Amino acid sequence: YWYKQITKDKQFDELEQSNFDWLFGCNPWGTSMVYGLPANADTPADPHSAFTHLGHYPIDGGLVDGPVYTSIYKNLIGITLYQPDEYATFQSDLAVYHDDYGDYSTNEPTMDGTASLIYLLAAKEAEYSSKKASPQKGASH
């Protein structure tokens, strides 16, 4: 967003939108990686978080780690899936993702990722608001 504001260069617009789409469900698992967003969609429901697991507190807007290479996942210690793998059909030899409290590698909320997501959402809102506030050239009133 800042890069585009300063340089007026739009070469990364498509990449930005693709990342946004991927985080919110246009990915091999068809699920958002953001707890509770979008509303009424497939989002993480059983994150590796004591707040939700023990206290039943929602962490709306929290970005989970997301997929990890299968080769890494298979060598991690201490991962136990507590529920049947609802994404088993979509798992591959390349990458896996589990919406399961027991998988800290793919389903743990991440502070740095959530902070970056907050920036992305704020930038999108600012971009939308500025377009809405300034009338288009040649538009009739």
Indicate residue ranges for each PLM-predicted region.
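Aromatic (Trp/Tyr) and acidic
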Residues: 1-138
